[in-house]
Amino acid sequence: MNNAFLGYYIGVEVDTLWFHATRVAEERREGRALVLLAETNDPLGHRMEIRLEPKAPGVITTSARVVPGSGPLASFARVAGAGFEAAPGERYLGFGERSNAADQTGREVFSWAEEGPFSSGAADDLLRPLLPEFTFPTGPAATNLPIPWTVTTRGFGVLIDQPHRSTFHLASDRNDAWRLEAEAGHLDFTVFAGPTPAKALRRYSEYAGRQPKPAPWFFGPWFQPTLEGRPFELADRFRKEDVPVSVVQTYTHYLPCGDHRGREQQERERIRGYHSRGYRITTYFNPHVCTDYGEAYGEAAARGFFIRNMLGRPYVLSNPFTADERVSEIDFTNPEAARFWQRLLDDAIDAGYDGWMEDFGEYTPTDSVAADGSGGLELHNRYPVLYHCASYEHTRKRMGRDAAIFVRSGFHGIQRCARIVWGGDPTEDWSCADGLCAAVHQTLSTGLSGIAYWGSDIGGFHALVNPRTDDELNARWLEFGAFSGIMRTQANGLSLLSSRADRSQVWHPAVMPIWRRYTKLRTRLAPYIQAASRTYQRRGLPITRHLALVFPRDARAVAQQEEFMFGPDLLVAPVIEKGARERSLYLPRGRWVDVWRSLAYRERSGAFRLGRATLLRGRREVT
């Protein structure tokens, strides 16, 4: 049915039949907007109203609506779409945070905020021959942070500018056209001119908003202690052994269940202890409230502050990993509910925390109802933006720039409210489904979507059906993490087959020297990273840059998916294969210096010394 979707059609789907505009019957001006009334190939005579309006230099919005004729088309139109011509060799980048690839050419990419994808781990050898792209829960395109946006290598970008579930068909069913579709009876999209991918991205990031200016200490190394009874032991050890670390991550769950209650004095003493040692410290929140968090749940339920079910009652969700934890979700479309939730944040702010993990946001049920009348299908993708922006507006007033709040969920518009994005809960493996390789794709795709301050769970989080992170994987992930927007390690996680004791940690003997080396290097790079951050604030160019943003006319550079520029001058090619002791990479045009052969590291002092540099010629592959 989609063969009629050529590279210049716009139309709607009714009961699996597509109808598209055929010719312009009328046109008129409404202010700056051009409004077209187009005839369609629908035999019942329905027409389409198409509105084009400039929003900024090089930015044009397009809205398409059905004008009813004599039949049921307007009532039953369920999908609207538009087609574009595909040029030979054109590539499609962006789409928010994506694990499976940075370049989605030839694929279908949907936008729906959800958990995943999770790697099949130890079951991979069994599943891969049968299901080549098998990943939990809904396949390789699953993501916590979809953005229905693409920047193409032809030098322009397109945003599906509505919250409904949408899909890009990227030359996946015909090589001369690509199209976009929204699961709604109308279509809103915005086009951003180039002429280069970097220029189109700049326009998009001006339109969507850029991440708030970070505090300098965000860019230092982060670590998570695991010694609950001895909270300062690792922090003191790192200071003693000359390992520079800026942030300590702790996870008292202020929400959903109010785990801080009865521990307030202990919390304050721990915070003071880390602060006195020169560390910043974070904790944990999510947008849910446990049904047994008496005073908080009772007030919120009585005042209508939760997302409701079809009967008008608080929608109660169950945690799939904790059977006895039942929660309801704050309704951020209600300003009073947002203010109630902000008061809960004050418990951690008043205790002295410097930030927190702001978890979840992807669970709004499709059959729920919000205070503003939105149904779950429309609210689902909007919810994480409303959630994180409620937090940002409050912490901006209470804490200024010194609020290290890191989020995993989002949608278009999240950029202006997400101080830090982390890549969700990756699998503790090497895979491009959800492991280390996937993290490289994530940093590139988020950067191409207007996000600069991003970091992964170094070492991974999930080990559902696979072994825990070993020393080799931990070391390689550390190397990659040192060249991410945020360098943040993970020490815990979720495993069904083994315990935390089986997991490699950065302070273990085999990894500690590597941890020290890369924290020292990261700290030495602080002025360079902060300069790259200022470039992002001015121009929207991310810290980790897909080569298409820097070398748009070099076809071989544009094709790379597992190497990137870190800031303006460093080309990074992480080792992402188990057992590898070398890897090849493509050097784009220009002259290059091999840092590792030109920079000497002294283990005893932790100092780096510049040695003799040999220039390498670009436009070729090296090992």
Identify the function of each model-found stretch.
Residues 72, 86, 252, 263-322, ...:
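Active-site-proximal helices and loops of the catalytic beta/alpha 8
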Residues 213-374, 415:
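Aromatic-lined carbohydrate-binding/catalytic grooves of carbohydrate-active enzymes
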Residues 3-5, 12-13, 392-404, 410-423, ...:
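Catalytic core of carbohydrate-active enzymes
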Residues 1-216, 222-227, 235-240, 411, ...:
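Catalytic and substrate-binding clefts that recognize carbohydrates or anionic sugar/phosphate headgroups
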Residues 420-440:
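Extracellular glycoside hydrolase catalytic/binding regions
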Residues 58-63, 148-149, 155-157, 188, ...:
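Beta-sheet entry/capping signal
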Residues 162, 223, 249-254, 285-292, ...:
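Short, solvent-exposed turn/loop segments enriched in Gly/Ser/Thr/Pro and often Arg
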